[in-house]
């Protein structure tokens, strides 16, 4: 992509309404535009990152055996009355009526709808286990939307729902999602810690929030710092095997949100030098809620003996759009964003330091064509901005690699390769720059 033809509305000044780093940088980098309180238009740069994150979430859900579908944003109020949650949910749920006076709601979550879909088609235990997920926009009418995508009213979520014949099978499904979440966040360059948490309006008696430690987080958390050193399962993890050892390894180390924190146990089990009491950002939460919805909504299957029983369920959410904010909070410096390569909008930026000069134009065009041909996402800054402005833009938007092409280096047959993560620079031949970025 040539920057001269791209839509990248960089802001020179920090908007006054932006309170935290991620919100400030997303606005300054031209990733978002606020259209109403807590509601944003996703501009091209932000949309590219959003799609990268969404794809990682999708790949890890598929790897764990979940099956993708897509449910509508609008739901019938009667479904929620059937489960008993319509009146219990509160003012965060946007309730509307169509021209025929039918009561609808803009879904904040999908337990009722997925249960209705399940009960319409699945009648036997032989169709289990089953895990269905979708990635869809949600709306919750937050009283005080703030912090950009961290606490917006409209947001993109991945929601998965598991269906099993009994509690033992349902807990195995829970474990699969637990491991899938560890892998998902690690692939994005995040250390997300699973912490015991309240189940809230979803219900049930087992839940973990996945928390990224950050001083700007909305949650107070307590944990043993040893949890930061635990290994994340690799691609070869067997989701059909026994995942209990992995779960025990992660849950035996103390980690809890404020709602379920046990002060005496924390003091007793965690050495003073490993105690962490800080804040964190919730990027995902998983629940086992047993037969709460299946009993209320008559989602029954015939067991091996032919007797109908309510299925045991779980739900598993990832805040896809919120993850952008969490990643920026964890990966930035005074100059801008430092995207992990897996989610960066572009892998590399070519900076023509003397636009219009025949030798630099030719070298940049050669690099651009070769990288595009090899499938590298590359942004070519072919604008007539001065070099300092190009450096500032590339640092602000956080592209992992910058290729600096100037007359002085070309005279020696080299370009400068800069790594955004640590600021390191190296002079390399053009062919070597291409080779590095296509490894």
UniProtKB/Swiss-Prot annotation:
InterPro entries: aa-tRNA-synt_IIb, aa-tRNA-synth_II, aa-tRNA-synth_II/BPL/LPL, Anticodon-bd, Anticodon-bd_dom_sf, Pro-tRNA-ligase_IIa, Pro-tRNA-synth_IIa_bac-type, Pro-tRNA_synthetase. It is an enzyme of class 6 (ligase). It comes from the Bacteria. Its EC number is 6.1.1.15. GO terms for cellular component: cytosol. One of its GO terms (biological process) is prolyl-tRNA aminoacylation. It holds the Pfam family HGTP_anticodon. Its main location: cytoplasm. Keywords: Aminoacyl-tRNA synthetase, ATP-binding, Cytoplasm, Ligase, Nucleotide-binding, Protein biosynthesis. NCBIfam families: PRK12325.1, proS_fam_II. Catalyzes the attachment of proline to tRNA(Pro) in a two-step reaction: proline is first activated by ATP to form Pro-AMP and then transferred to the acceptor end of tRNA(Pro). Homodimer. This is Proline--tRNA ligase. It comes from Rhodopseudomonas palustris (strain BisA53). The lineage of its organism: Bacteria, Pseudomonadati, Pseudomonadota, Alphaproteobacteria, Hyphomicrobiales. The gene is proS.
